[in-house]
Amino acid sequence: TTAKHVIDDLNGRIDMIIDDGSIEIGLESTIVDLTEDVPVILRPGYVTFEMLEETVGEVRLDKALMTGVKGNVKPKAPGMKYRHYAPKAELTIIEGSPEKTVARIEELVKEAERKGQKAGIMLSEENFDKICSDYKLCLGSSSDENEIACLRKFDDMDIDVIFSEGFSEEGIGQAIMNRLLKAAGHKIIEV
């Protein structure tokens, strides 16, 4: 998140924003609950499950990470319960083999265009050249962490719907998928 994104979201609702420029790591911090015998990751971030496990031993993931917090349950960490990091357009994540994912995204884009919608596509560097579109953005390598900036760019393009490939949930990919799932309201198509 950049200072501009914060201003866009919170202008008039907060008194001040301190902007120290861009950061190297495009993800928020990892939040860990240490109140139980085994540490529980409430929000994955740049410090990965694997890094924590190597340092402290056994670590668990909060069950709500992939399903979201439901009903009247109080979230244990910021950003757990509601659609978060969400673009204006509806976001759908497509998961499966790279070939099937690319083919399904192409079908979904054609469907959207037939309805007169402008469809944005988020792809990894590995799949970026496999689809032709004026409205596609590259997330970088499938282990990169600039998905929030991509979602914001789609807002600037007045995109109606966004289709993103899913990413491996190993290492930093876990945090990326966590943010994408929140932004998509957990809407996934398996292919």
Set out the residue ranges of the language-model regions.
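Active-site-adjacent structural elements in enzyme catalytic cores
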Residues: 1-191
